[in-house]
Amino acid sequence: MQIKRSIEKIPGGMMLVPLFLGALCHTFSPGAGKYFGSFTNGMITGTVPILAVWFFCMGASIKLSATGTVLRKSGTLVVTKIAVAWVVAAIASRIIPEHGVEVGFFAGLSTLALVAAMDMTNGGLYASIMQQYGTKEEAGAFVLMSLESGPLMTMIILGTAGIASFEPHVFVGAVLPFLVGFALGNLDPELREFFSKAVQTLIPFFAFALGNTIDLTVIAQTGLLGILLGVAVIIVTGIPLIIADKLIGGGDGTAGIAASSSAGAAVATPVLIAEMVPAFKPMAPAATSLVATAVIVTSILVPILTSIWSRKVKARAAKIEILGTVK
């Protein structure tokens, strides 16, 4: 049976399929973890420890050395994405109620959901798209996108926008596994190779545990809103990313639109933030569902939109070249 190949046909499948299975487990048998106990309970409820190991391995996979082109491109995209998320957070905090919207079509929408959906790029999706439509340097720009993984950037955005306050040691605790992994991976290439293999392997495990925090009835209630959130992520982050790629990154905008997705890891952010700041706990389930839907939507639409953009840009460039030759 080609289970893995079938799952990978779904955009973000290795994240989303286990997430859905976990949500099924939580919806129809919410006490399964406590009933079985031991290792089974650990797999069902171990979101934070599994993610801690994943962040460590993610840090170990990043090479310190990179070309100037790669750093300029990736730095431009990462800073722009985070800046846009900060602006959205600052505006949303003045419009959306403190505990999120509780009634009506926008029920479940919160500043936490907006920031979590917008401040991370799906690095793997970006790299695969740019390998097809861009240069090797542009594809390699995902190197700094790993820095967005985890709750740190969301914490910084929420903190600096005045939405939440975090003690300094909480910031350190959030980034320490990543930094230790980063240090070890760059001190010893063999350790980098060893730990980086676990990055993809751990995704289904933390996705399943994360799914066990989601009630499918919440997803049913926020489905259409989640789709609209995914579209909003592409529009709100995509336009500034295209402009930044052209003006600063030295590209034609293709990398910008390729970076306008939501990362699968962003699905875990609401739960992790709620663990640190209990005030966010009531919002976390709906925010998780919204972000999960946004991840699916952006995973489907971003490759299509990038393909259309790339074809138009290349056709325009070819036309200009022909006109120049004629003259």
Swiss-Prot record:
Residues 31-41, 94, 160-162, 220-223, 275-288 are periplasmic. Pfam families: KdgT. InterPro entries: 2keto-3dGluconate_permease (IPR004684), 2keto-3dGluconate_permease_sub (IPR018395). It catalyses: 2-dehydro-3-deoxy-D-gluconate(in) + H(+)(in) = 2-dehydro-3-deoxy-D-gluconate(out) + H(+)(out). It comes from the Bacteria. Induction: Repressed by the HTH-type transcriptional regulator KdgR. Induced in the presence of KDG. Uptake is completely abolished by carbonyl cyanide p-trifluoromethoxyphenylhydrazone (FCCP) or nigericin. One of its GO terms (molecular function) is 2-keto-3-deoxygluconate:proton symporter activity. It is found in: Cell inner membrane. GO terms for biological process: gluconate transmembrane transport. Residues 1-9, 63-72, 116-138, 184-198, 245-253, 310-327 are cytoplasmic. Keywords: Cell inner membrane, Cell membrane, Membrane, Sugar transport, Symport, Transmembrane, Transmembrane helix, Transport. The chain crosses the membrane at residues 10-30, 42-62, 73-93, 95-115, 139-159, 163-183, 199-219, 224-244, 254-274, 289-309. GO terms for cellular component: membrane; plasma membrane. Belongs to the KdgT transporter family. Catalyzes the proton-dependent uptake of 2-keto-3-deoxygluconate (KDG) into the cell. Expression of this specific KDG-uptake system may allow growth with KDG as the sole carbon source. Can also transport D-glucuronate. This is 2-keto-3-deoxygluconate permease. It comes from Escherichia coli (strain K12). The gene is kdgT.
